[in-house]
Swiss-Prot record:
Binding annotation for FAD: 16, 36, 45, 56, 62, 105
Transmembrane segments: none
Enzyme category, top tier: oxidoreductase
Top-level taxon in the UniProt lineage: Bacteria
UniProt key word Flavoprotein: yes
Pfam families associated with the record: FMO-like (PF00743)
Lineage of the organism: Bacteria, Bacillati, Actinomycetota, Actinomycetes, Mycobacteriales
Homology family: Belongs to the FAD-binding monooxygenase family.
EC number(s) recorded for this UniProt protein: 1.14.13.-
The keyword Oxidoreductase belongs to this UniProt entry's keyword annotation: yes
Cofactor(s) of this protein: FAD
Name of the molecule in the record: Uncharacterized monooxygenase Rv0892
Keywords linked to the UniProt accession: FAD, Flavoprotein, Monooxygenase, NADP, Oxidoreductase
A GO CC annotation given for this chain: peptidoglycan-based cell wall
Length: 495
């Protein structure tokens, strides 16, 4: 049987980009080019290298189901170990020669049935399908703190760690109390002379231990791959149960809250405990996983500051109460612009439609992967994907399989371009909005899950429902078209 040979561009060589590329190659779709702005694969795990960096999803779950690693050294892997895993995946599946490193896609426009891409070097290329896999959290957010440029010490964002800066014995300020801030305090305590954590909002912490895997355990996992499969299924089941607490009020949510509150009681000083107690429900913000934070924050060389930051001067940080906190290094653990998606790429779809105009009221998509008006364009980890405390590898695999099913239909000549119908997309998003009031994200907090109107942009159901949704294609929800220019130039391929 013969079919056409689709050309596919994937933007991003992180976890999701490599996942969709491997899925394409496994389906016999080989004309694939990956554009990567940096000089290595890995995305988040390449960019983030700060002390204490640890994945908050278990190692045996935060991996591709088709490439399980028997050699994880601990339950929650360090960032460097995950980066090594992703580098190994790139080698194992022959991805490196398909990647254009140091190439930032600055624009992509749909023209006569194909996508025309332009990189920052001015190079243009034309493809049948464009897949954005630029990740969720990759644009560092720098807070507008007055006087930051006046500081005579060193300032950097946690995702742009400066490894030339000595840490031993230094006075280090950590601004931010999310997962990164918590991991930094744990990683710097006992190394720095003093760590001062500046807290705007207290976070709920789930005390998940992080035991190391013995050499014997790794030997057994190498000898018996079924053990890795069993562990993967067991962790998947536990996170499905956790999802019930997120999407529905009831016993599961109460149990998670009870564990968080019990852990907080380990803080002995009543004043410190009150300062660390959030005024919202557990899981309303992204839950912080740490078995060591409450121990670290009680050290004599660690201080929690809850007064707001007024400004920065050359010696340090001045808070609203007029106190000067003298420091040598300021680390901004202030998160990312979670709504930027594939920026800085300027996306122009059918009839000159610009993504900035379509998304002026907030990002939205059909079934988390496609957008009306942008034919043959897909997103990995798009709006309302199950992100947060879920294993993104599993989410990426489901989306990659769905995308490849569409491209295989193109290969067999069923259509030239496809895009979701506006009515189908609106109906889908109406269902999502109707489910949001039951979720924990609407219980009264401000987080990066929310758009500018305070509406969560995450998946309001269990991950299993997301997988089921993507398991089948629904052509009736898509506008399938023919383009003479596409059919005239498409190359045949054995299928």
């Amino acid at each position: 049987m013969t079919g056409r040979c689709p050309t596919v561009a994937v933007v991003g060589a992180g976890m999701s980009g490599m996942c969709v590329a491997i899925t394409l190659l496994s389906a016999g779709i080989t004309d694939v080019c990956i554009y990567e702005k940096a000089d290595d694969v890995g995305g988040t795990w390449r960019d983030n290298t700060y002390p204490g960096l640890t994945c908050d999803v278990p190692s045996r779950l935060y991996q591709y189901s088709f490439a399980k690693n028997p050699n994880w050294t601990q339950m929650f892997s360090r960032g460097g170990e995950i980066q090594d895993y992703l580098r190994g995946i790139a080698e194992r599946y022959g991805l490196r020669h398909r990647i254009r490193f140091g190439a930032t896609v600055v624009s992509a426009r749909f023209d006569d049935g194909r996508w025309v891409l332009r990189t920052d070097s001015g190079t243009e290329s034309t493809v049948d399908f464009l897949i954005s896999a630029t990740g969720v959290l990759h644009h560092p957010r720098i807070p507008p703190i007055a006087g930051l440029d006046d500081f005579r010490g060193t300032v950097f964002h946690s995702a742009r760690w400066d490894h030339t800066v000595p840490l031993l014995g230094r006075r280090i300020a950590v601004i931010g109390t999310g997962s990164t801030g918590v991991q930094l305090v744990c990683g710097l305590a006992g190394v720095a002379g003093k760590v001062t954590m500046f807290q705007r909002t207290a976070q709920w912490v789930l005390p998940w231990p992080n035991p190391r895997y013995s050499k014997l355990a790794r030997v057994f996992h190498r000898a018996f791959p079924c053990l890795g499969s069993l562990a993967y299924k067991a962790y998947s089941l536990s996170f499905e149960t956790f999802a019930v607490a997120l999407s529905n009020p009831g016993l599961h949510r109460k149990l998670v809250g009870a564990v968080c509150r019990a852990s907080l009681r380990r803080v002995r000083d009543p004043r410190l405990r009150r300062a660390l107690t959030p005024d919202y429900e557990p899981m309303c913000k992204r839950l912080v996983m740490s078995g060591g934070f409450y121990r670290a924050i009680q050290r004599d060389d660690v201080e929690l500051v809850t007064a707001g930051i007024d400004h920065v001067e050359h010696r340090g940080i001045v808070t609203d109460d007029g106190v000067l906190h003298e420091v040598d290094v300021i680390v901004l653990a202030t998160g990312f612009d979670s709504h930027a998606f594939f920026r800085p790429m300027q996306l122009t779809g059918r009839d000159g439609i610009r993504i900035d105009d379509v998304w002026q009221d907030g990002p939205h998509a059909h079934q988390t992967v496609a957008i009306p008006g942008f034919p043959n364009f897909f997103m990995m980890l798009g709006p309302h994907s199950p992100v947060g405390n879920f294993p993104l590898t599993a989410v990426a695999e489901s989306q990659a399989e769905h995308i490849v099913q569409w491209i295989k239909r193109w290969r067999h000549g069923e259509f030239d371009t496809m895009e979701p119908k506006s009515a189908a997309t609106e109906a889908y998003n109406t269902v999502l909005r109707a489910a949001m009031p039951n979720t924990v994200w609407t219980t009264g907090c401000d987080s990066w899950y929310l758009n500018k109107d305070g509406i969560p942009e995450v998946w309001p159901f269990a991950p299993a429902k997301h997988r089921a949704m993507l398991a089948n294609l629904h052509p009736e929800e898509y506008d399938l078209r023919r383009y003479a220019a596409v059919r005239a130039t498409s190359r045949p391929q054995s299928a």
